[in-house]
């Protein structure tokens, strides 16, 4: 007689109930809400560090440039308003990406032009030709001549446009017009000797957010570690279009790193992060520019 084994019925696991599913979704939403700000902050910090690395490379390049320069000048700009960075490329900083802050969408086209065709439109306070200031480099990159914020095609909302992300502070006590036709007394070019021995000339009164900040620098000896050389580009921009102008040389939300602050290269070659609250004071000692105003923005 055959024995017929009873078939075992395998029970399938019960599915999630609607309530359990909603609880899981709620937990995922809470975790995302907690993690996303942290990830955003980590991204911002990483961009800031990468930008600082860019400036460190430019700081090292400026020291080598000065060592090889006949006047031991720390930059190759023609006056205090000039932000041209061609004097660094390619001899001292060979990578064009170094001139773009990773917190922006600025761009630089690698299209070398002959220096022989360069037309000087700014006042030249150096006594040197453009080719001499480029240390006999025969070409230049047009997009390295100015910061992206100054370009006519710049979009402040997306931080997009051709040009560099960094300004140059090649002269101390900069308070004169930089037009080619100007005949006023030139400012003092930052050389290795000037950075080590300069005596401040002015008492500065800065209007900052409704307060007057006074910096009595006159007679004090400057230091290479406090004098600015290169910094996060920060010119005044009208944004939104037709709206208020942002502040010049003061971190606003549309600037490279927003209102947090900015990276700065000093005349001794080191670079550091400077918080927004410290910006006016470091700007005073770093540039000795007489005119400085900060208004609420936006």
Regions from the language model: what does each represent?
Residues 5, 16-22, 32, 60, ...:
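Generic hydrophobic-segment detector
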Residues 49-298:
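Short, well-structured segments within or immediately adjacent to enzyme catalytic domains
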Residues 4, 10-53:
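Amphipathic alpha-helical segments typified by the pilin-like N-terminal helix
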């Amino acid at each position: 007689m055959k024995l017929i084994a009873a078939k075992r019925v395998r029970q399938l696991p019960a599915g999630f109930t609607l309530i359990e599913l909603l609880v899981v979704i709620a937990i995922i939403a809470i975790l995302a809400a907690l993690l996303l700000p942290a990830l955003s902050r980590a991204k911002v910090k990483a961009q800031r560090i990468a930008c600082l690395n860019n400036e460190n490379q430019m700081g090292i390049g400026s020291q080598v440039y000065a060592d090889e320069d006949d006047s031991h000048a720390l930059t190759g700009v023609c006056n205090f308003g000039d932000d041209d960075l061609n004097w660094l490329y390619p001899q001292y900083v060979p990578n064009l990406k170094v001139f773009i802050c990773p917190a922006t969408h600025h761009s630089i086209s690698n299209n070398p032009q002959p220096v022989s065709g360069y037309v000087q439109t700014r006042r030249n306070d150096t006594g040197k030709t453009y080719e001499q200031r480029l240390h006999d480099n025969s070409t230049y990159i047009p997009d390295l001549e100015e910061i992206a914020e100054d370009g006519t095609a710049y979009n402040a909302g997306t931080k997009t446009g051709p040009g560099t992300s960094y300004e140059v502070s090649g002269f101390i006590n900069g308070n004169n017009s930089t037009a080619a036709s100007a005949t006023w007394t030139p400012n003092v070019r930052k050389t290795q000797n000037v950075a080590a021995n300069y005596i401040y000339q002015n008492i500065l009164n800065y209007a900052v957010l409704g307060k007057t900040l006074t910096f009595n620098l006159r007679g004090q000896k400057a230091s290479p570690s406090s004098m600015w050389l290169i910094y996060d580009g920060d010119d005044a921009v009208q944004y939104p279009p037709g709206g208020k102008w942002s502040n010049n040389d003061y971190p606003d939300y549309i600037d490279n790193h927003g209102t947090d602050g900015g990276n700065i290269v000093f005349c001794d070659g080191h670079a550091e992060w400077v918080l927004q609250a410290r910006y006016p004071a470091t700007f005073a000692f770093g540039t000795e520019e007489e005119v400085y105003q900060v208004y609420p923005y936006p």
